[in-house]
Curated annotation (Swiss-Prot):
InterPro entries: YaaA. One of its GO terms (cellular component) is cytosol. It holds the Pfam family H2O2_YaaD. Belongs to the UPF0246 family. This is UPF0246 protein Bxeno_A1262. It comes from the Bacteria.
């Protein structure tokens, strides 16, 4: 079983990592190709392309200039310890043990516009390049064209290392990022957990809570060494509970109702 997550825009390179073990991303050459194109852009062009402030554009202009195909402790940090958004607050990798992170290496993957597909302990140099960015490149009009089938092929290769009964992909990524995966070419079924909160008289997806819950679920799977999707139904962190009536074979719905 493999759980896929989206990356985060915010990054933490201030907190020292609590583990030394690290790996190098599989698609460094592809990332270098993208960086080469990004280096041709001015800060103003970056701001327009990514719809970000001038300050953020200048920061990323500098990041692209400093990016190196050589990764080390001086310029990079393990992905799940560097990402710092809602999902990663839920996953809270800095409190996972070395054994937990070793397990996550084989069962968690992060989709990335720049790096394609990351293992939790893959070293990450700071960047910003969302998967949905319409960045024209030699392979096509955007990053979906750039990555093509490569991400799906990499997931298939990892899935084949699992026992047949455990070959399932759990989609805890956003729609923007999961579009980089091609389910028809995936050699495993896909299960998508959905997290809903009660608000305004009905259950609905609230983005902040749903993102955090995806991280919580990934952590739950890692800490409990889950290898079958039905085990996810017991997830009950922070008040969520599996709703069988609202779910089906490919969508697991978890709901939470707290006092308004």
């Amino acid at each position: 079983m493999i759980i896929v997550l989206s990356p985060a825009k915010s990054l933490d390179y201030e907190t020292p990592p609590h583990v030394k073990k690290h790996t190098i991303p599989d698609f460094v050459e592809d990332a270098a190709e993208l960086i080469g194109g990004l280096r041709l852009l001015s800060p103003q062009q970056i701001a327009s392309l990514m719809d970000i402030s001038d300050q953020l554009a200048h920061l990323n202009f500098q990041r692209y200039a400093e990016w190196s195909p050589k990764f080390g402790a001086h310029n990079a940090k393990q992905a799940v310890l560097a990402f710092n958004g809602d999902v990663y607050e839920g996953f809270n990798a800095k409190t996972l043990s070395a054994a937990d992170l070793d397990y996550a290496q084989n069962h968690v993957r992060v989709l990335s516009g720049l790096y394609g597909l990351l293992r939790p302990l893959d070293l990450l140099q700071p960047y910003r390049l969302e998967m949905g960015t319409r960045f024209a490149n030699p392979r096509g009009k955007d990053l979906y064209a750039f990555w093509g089938e490569r991400i799906t092929q990499a997931l298939n290769a990892q899935l084949k290392k699992n026992a047949v009964a455990s070959r399932v992909l759990v989609n805890c990524a956003s729609g923007e990022y999961f579009r980089s995966v091609k389910p028809k070419l995936l050699e495993a079924p896909v299960i998508t957990p959905v997290f809903e909160d009660w608000k305004g008289g009905r259950y609905k997806i609230i983005s902040f809570h749903a993102k955090r819950a995806r991280g919580l679920m990934a952590r739950y799977a890692v800490e409990n060494r889950l290898d079958r999707p039905e085990q996810l139904k017991d997830f009950n962190a922070e008040g969520y509970a599996f709703d069988a009536e609202a779910s089906n074979d490919s969508t697991y719905v978890f709901r939470r109702r707290v006092a308004e």
